[in-house]
């Protein structure tokens, strides 16, 4: 595997996305940071540059088809191919809502408009970007699509009363990750005869802005499994945790 491989990371201005970029840059990969807020993206770019690293940055709201196409055109013009797509961008609830996450994410108290807003980014944005990048990934010797998922998206774990995540019933977010898992399964089958492998990775409960300070894992620990999927190409077509344990769909 060439250390000059080109990697696009969505939601890379903070948390897992930023740390994943940092670890991959230190391994010699060419990393493109992307996020929807250009100011925050440039701050992340400058932070990594101050650490002696050299990423690129492009503004990218994955729920905006025009920005998705602009990202494709920029990467095609700059590099001519893409080796790894890391679908990290996601939201747990509706951005700028005046309701609490619990209110907007619960099946009975949330409404369809709120669930749709979550799906626009976590599901349809992820799918639109992935499909747009396929021609560039096809040019790679070993293309990889890494979808950031969650154990909360496992139907089996959500249904089992003995599961540690049984009582976490955030319908909007959880069901969006269930669909990300389904996208992973379908893509792996559709691309079986190509050079592209597809992965679903649950980095665990990480101390990010989304995961909160109550989480069990530090950000570098969560990012490490994403990096491992890139470098070791483990678990193609499957859903696994930061311990490399398989998770039931």
Predicted regions located by residue number:
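Hydrophobic positions on the long internal alpha-helix
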Residues: 86, 129-133, 137, 183-184
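A glycine-rich helix->loop->beta "capping" turn
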Residues: 51-54, 74-87, 91-95, 109-111
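Catalytic loop of short-chain dehydrogenase/reductase
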Residues: 91, 95-119, 138-192
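The beta1-alpha1 cofactor-binding region of Rossmann-like NAD(H)/NADP(H)-dependent oxidoreductases
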Residues: 38-39, 59-73, 112
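C-terminal helical subdomain
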Residues: 178, 193, 200-201, 208, ...
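Canonical Rossmann dinucleotide-binding motif of NAD(H)/NADP(H)-dependent dehydrogenases/reductases
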Residues: 2-32
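Conserved glycine-rich Rossmann-like NAD(P)H-binding loop of the short-chain dehydrogenase/reductase
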Residues: 27-43
């Amino acid at each position: 595997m060439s250390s000059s491989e080109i990697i696009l990371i969505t939601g890379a201005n903070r948390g897992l996305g930023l740390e994943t970029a940092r670890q991959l840059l230190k391994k010699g990969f060419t990393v493109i940071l992307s996020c929807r807020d250009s100011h925050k993206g440039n701050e992340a770019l400058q932070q990594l540059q101050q650490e002696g690293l050299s990423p690129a940055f492009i503004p990218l709201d994955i729920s905006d088809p025009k920005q998705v196409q602009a990202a494709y055109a920029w990467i095609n013009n700059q590099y001519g191919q893409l080796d790894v797509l890391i679908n990290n961008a996601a939201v747990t609830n509706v951005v700028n809502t005046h309701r609490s996450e619990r209110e907007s994410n619960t099946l009975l108290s949330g409404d369809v408009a709120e669930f749709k807003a979550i799906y626009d980014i976590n599901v349809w944005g992820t799918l639109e970007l992935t499909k747009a990048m396929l021609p560039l990934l096809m040019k790679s010797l070993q293309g990889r699509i890494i979808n950031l998922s969650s154990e909360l998206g496992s139907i089996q774990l959500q249904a089992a009363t003995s599961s540690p995540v049984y009582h976490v019933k955030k319908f909007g977010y959880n069901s969006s990750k269930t669909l990300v898992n389904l996208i992973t399964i379908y893509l792996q089958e559709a691309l079986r005869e190509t050079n592209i492998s597809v992965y679903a990775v649950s980095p665990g409960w990480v101390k990010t802005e989304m995961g909160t300070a109550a989480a069990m894992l530090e950000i570098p620990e969560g990012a490490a499994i994403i990096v491992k999927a890139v470098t070791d190409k483990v678990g193609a077509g499957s859903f696994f945790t930061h311990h490399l344990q398989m998770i039931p769909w």
